[in-house]
């Protein structure tokens, strides 16, 4: 057992040193905000409204990404990016389509990348675009899932 004086000096030195380095006090205050439970329906409604604004921004981002890719990199190919989603989905995802708008799916990208007449630079650019598409789709899916869950929670609160 450490004597009380030594224990206080040791703990005090460690705590003071930690709080001075890297602004831990500010970080701890920030992190505590994430750990607080929602206090009520009003906070859920505010969060839902923020997420719906994010969904509108993501919808426009999908349109912009598709337009830029289709008018630039993919212009001379038979491959397009298309914003897609079921009716009522807040944020649309980006899907691969053929330029005739008859087929959709990842298999179109795989078929395009397996062609021998595609330059290595073009292949790498399309792969980079696919990475951007995947990241965007993950963001859109998170927004959609969160809005759906908040809607269910609000409905449960109404029925309680």
Per-region residue spans from a language model:
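Short, charged low-complexity intrinsically disordered segments located at boundaries
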Residues: 1, 92, 159-160
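Compositionally biased amphipathic helical and low-complexity segments enriched in hydrophobic
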Residues: 5, 36, 75, 80, ...
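Short, flexible coil/linker segments at or flanking structured domains
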Residues: 32, 82-84, 117, 124
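Amphipathic alpha-helical coiled-coil segments
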Residues: 44, 48-58, 122, 129-143, ...
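Hydrophobic stripe of amphipathic alpha-helices that form coiled-coil interfaces
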Residues: 58-61, 65-76, 136, 143-146, ...
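Amphipathic, interaction-prone secondary-structure segments
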Residues: 63-99
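Intrinsically disordered, low-complexity regulatory segments enriched in Ser/Thr/Pro
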Residues: 93-132
